């Protein structure tokens, strides 16, 4: 992911900083303990697509109810 883009992106929930996890292709918000997927090089910054960081990617379920 482009570092210039990373400088602009923030968590859509708390507006905090995100970190790029290269191994899981996700952006992580440490404050909310959420991981946002990156699909085809595009970050999916929707709360409904995020997973809790306590889950493994294979166990992930959308957070929306």
Swiss-Prot record:
Belongs to the UPF0434 family. InterPro entries: Trm112-like (IPR005651). Gene3D superfamilies: 2.20.25.10. One of its GO terms (cellular component) is cytosol. SUPFAM superfamilies: Trm112p-like. This is UPF0434 protein Mpe_A2486. It comes from Methylibium petroleiphilum (strain ATCC BAA-1232 / LMG 22953 / PM1).
């Amino acid at each position: 992911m482009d570092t210039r883009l990373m400088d602009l992106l923030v968590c859509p929930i708390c507006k905090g900083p995100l970190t790029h996890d290269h191994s899981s292709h996700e952006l992580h918000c440490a404050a909310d303990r959420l991981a946002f997927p990156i699909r085809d090089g595009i970050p999916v910054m929707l709360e409904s697509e995020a997973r809790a960081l306590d889950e493994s990617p294979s166990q992930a379920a959308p957070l929306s109810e």
